[in-house]
Design a protein with these regions (language model features):
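Intrinsically disordered, glycine/charged-rich C-terminal tails and inter-domain linkers
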Residues: 1-8, 19-20, 26-143
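A short beta-strand-to-alpha-helix junction
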Residues: 11-15
Length: 143
């Protein structure tokens, strides 16, 4: 077979799961996303950032945005805010929505087109306003 067929064969669970989120990724401005199993193989050759995890059919996959797929200016802005973004994400996972919200706001001041940071910012706001209470899922794009 060809490379595409081999890739699909080797990573069929991940491919099936990611296919469900293609439109959400596009809407969030994510040009390329990979699971942790792929990112581990390519992280030394590419720039990327952890953006969260997805849950599907009993599986949980960590998701990385490949920043090399972005235009140069956008890529640089996301690289410049990567550490702040990941710290904000960790605060979100620790249910520190106030500090997480503040850091996501800082990320957006530097990189206003970061739709993933915007999504988490709004989710932090909802959690702070008790729309979700303690039952919030930390999964990316969960509704």
């Amino acid at each position: 077979g060809n490379d595409e067929q081999a890739f699909t064969y080797l990573l069929s669970k991940e491919m099936k799961m990611l296919e469900k989120y293609v439109e959400r990724f596009r809407a969030a401005g994510i040009r390329m996303a990979v699971t942790d199993s792929v990112y581990e193989l390519i992280e030394k050759e590419t720039a990327g950032r952890y953006i969260g995890y997805l849950e599907s059919e009993g599986y949980t996959f960590k998701i990385y945005e490949i920043l090399d797929a972005c235009p140069a200016k956008e890529r640089q802005k996301r690289l410049d805010t990567k550490e702040k973004f990941e710290k904000a994400l960790n605060l979100f996972y620790q249910e520190d929505y106030y500090l997480g919200r503040n850091l996501f706001t800082e990320v957006l001041k530097e990189c206003p087109d970061d739709e993933v940071a915007k999504w988490y910012l709004f989710l932090c706001e909802k959690c702070l306003n008790a729309e979700y209470g303690k039952s919030v899922s930390g999964a990316l794009f969960s509704d």
